[in-house]
Amino acid sequence: MKRSGRFITLLIGAIVIACFSGRALAADDKAAKPADLVLTGDAVCTSCHDASDDATPTLANRHPSVMAIGKTRHGTRADGRTPSCTSCHGESDQHRKTRGNTKPDVLFSKQGATPVEARNAACLSCHKEGNRIGWHTSTHGLQDLSCSSCHSVHAQRDKVREKQTQAEVCFACHKEQRNQISKASHHPVVEGKMTCSSCHNVHGDNPKMLVKASTNETCFTCHMEKRGPFVHNHQPVTEDCGICHQPHGTTIPNLLKARAPFLCQDCHSHDSHPGQAAALPNAPSNSTSMLGTVARGCLNCHTNIHGGNSTVNSATAGRFRR
Ligand code: HEC
Ligand code: HEC
Ligand code: HEC
Ligand code: HEC
Ligand code: HEC
Ligand code: HEC
Ligand code: HEC
Ligand code: HEC
Ligand code: HEC
Ligand code: HEC
């Protein structure tokens, strides 16, 4: 990588000199057989496309420096599998013959006429394995996203694969998640400690494109202690963490969708609470809504809301108390 970086610096230098020294050099160039500039076999394209393309970026907000591809994994000359220009853009015979007056076979920009399937097929010819196995039936695949909706292959830094910048790429299309993740209680994505892809495989066909087959399995990859096994399970917890938590962010601490007692009273009775006795406040009626207004409410007593292991007292053990 370093070597190709230096190579490009030299190359740019050479071009600058070539420009200044004018026609004499241009004549020499014509005589010489074009050499590969970045990748083995790329001379068919780099005889015309060289670092001078960089001065006129074609994509409004990405500025692909065409030759910067030499500094990416796609520029590793030592690797026999490395693509050349034609592996992605096609042989483009017509384009070459007409000296750029017709389009290359595969053009990745949205304005280009190449259908999405053909653009993606160019990448998938080498990358259909691993994470991408489910691409065609993934939500993104079915929505006709192209690989280059997210990836910038010519840029030295591919924003979507860097922790600090990935979310920006997603937010271009996912405004609602931008809003959620910047709420007071959130997973540390904007802080750069984790990324959207910590939970999502955006090439995959799992539900909600999660990295695992279910929400719970995804959460357990980091919050193992919530998996149990517990002696007493709380049914909504084993069912779906998302019943109580909004994984991106909320205004309520602990990413909760609502505060106790309201959170609990979605399912548990508003107007009765058993064993209303000495330990419990003296309420006019045996009402959980009365209990809920006491201090921190339900969670003051039902502390092990994700599941309890207590075997001390069979009457309280199943109630997620210590
Ligand atoms: C004989 C010169 C020549 C050769 C050889 C050549 N091109 Fe081009 N190419 C051009 C010109 C001229 C343009 C139009 C100006 C521009 O957009 O930079 C162009 C434009 C392009 C574009 C942008 C098209 C658009 O509409 O945005 C791509 C992509 C491209 N060429 C890829 C390639 C590839 C890949 C090869 C090798 C297979 C290749 N070119 C070989 C001259 C050439
Ligand atoms: C790994 C696949 C791949 C390889 C290899 C590749 N390109 Fe590209 N090229 C793309 C994609 C994708 C874009 C769209 C912009 C981006 O993602 O950076 C693009 C954009 C371009 C553009 C700008 C026009 C546009 O559509 O935005 C030119 C010119 C170009 N490539 C020429 C080349 C040349 C010359 C080579 C060989 C040195 C080459 N490409 C190698 C995938 C590739
Ligand atoms: C001719 C084969 C080939 C084609 C076509 C190809 N790639 Fe690659 N790609 C590779 C190789 C080889 C590597 C480096 C080894 C690896 O990571 O597996 C790579 C690596 C990558 C990486 C990871 C880079 C890293 O730093 O780890 C991404 C992302 C990628 N390619 C995206 C694309 C996209 C998007 C396209 C289409 C525009 C594309 N590739 C087309 C062969 C190809
Ligand atoms: C919605 C945005 C998005 C789209 C669309 C997308 N990718 Fe990715 N890609 C990512 C992100 C994020 C990563 C890094 C995290 C990961 O590996 O899941 C990545 C990683 C990769 C890697 C390197 C990871 C590895 O396994 O080594 C390759 C290769 C790749 N993508 C190829 C593709 C191809 C091919 C397509 C089109 C079929 C595509 N991507 C479409 C966002 C995207
Ligand atoms: C070019 C636009 C675009 C970009 C960029 C993009 N997405 Fe999407 N994404 C979509 C569309 C379109 C859908 C389907 C409709 C919807 O749910 O909004 C979708 C759906 C999703 C879904 C829901 C999946 C499901 O099965 O319901 C997730 C999760 C997702 N995207 C994550 C991401 C992540 C993470 C990134 C960044 C790495 C990203 N997206 C980048 C367009 C995009
Ligand atoms: C902590 C794990 C986690 C992180 C980090 C995360 N997500 Fe999600 N995301 C989920 C889960 C779980 C769901 C499914 C929620 C559900 O079932 O309603 C989801 C759903 C989605 C959906 C579909 C929403 C819908 O209503 O169908 C989109 C789009 C999405 N996420 C985008 C993103 C983006 C963009 C990022 C990064 C800014 C991101 N996610 C980060 C876990 C996560
Ligand atoms: C990639 C690792 C990872 C995954 C996967 C993950 N989390 Fe987290 N989670 C974290 C980190 C890191 C924190 C922040 C801890 C801190 O700030 O001390 C956190 C914090 C939390 C918090 C406490 C927030 C607060 O305000 O302190 C809750 C609740 C939570 N996660 C729920 C979930 C749920 C539900 C899922 C599954 C949808 C999930 N997490 C998936 C890493 C992860
Ligand atoms: C019945 C609602 C509910 C469900 C379902 C639920 N949680 Fe929670 N979770 C809570 C409440 C309430 C808190 C706050 C606890 C407190 O304040 O003592 C919390 C706090 C957390 C915390 C941060 C504090 C801690 O205990 O580490 C994490 C992490 C967490 N939950 C993960 C999960 C995971 C993972 C799942 C799915 C396996 C899940 N939760 C399912 C209600 C729920
Ligand atoms: C999505 C619905 C739902 C939510 C929200 C919910 N629970 Fe539950 N909870 C249940 C179900 C279902 C059971 C099992 C009932 C049974 O076994 O009779 C249960 C059981 C319990 C039990 C044990 C009951 C017993 O008979 O052993 C307690 C205590 C409890 N929940 C407290 C809470 C608290 C406190 C909250 C709020 C933080 C809460 N629950 C939120 C559905 C929910
Ligand atoms: C002051 C402590 C305390 C508070 C506050 C409290 N509980 Fe309880 N809860 C208990 C005890 C103790 C039991 C076991 C009583 C028994 O089995 O006789 C119990 C039992 C339960 C049960 C099991 C009901 C059954 O039929 O067996 C549920 C459900 C429950 N509580 C939900 C809640 C909810 C929801 C809240 C908040 C609105 C709440 N509790 C607030 C102490 C408390």
Where are these regions (language model features)?
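Positively charged n-region of N-terminal signal peptides that target proteins for export
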Residues: 1-7
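Short sequence/structural segments immediately N-terminal
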Residues: 5, 19-322
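Bacterial N-terminal signal peptides
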Residues: 9-19
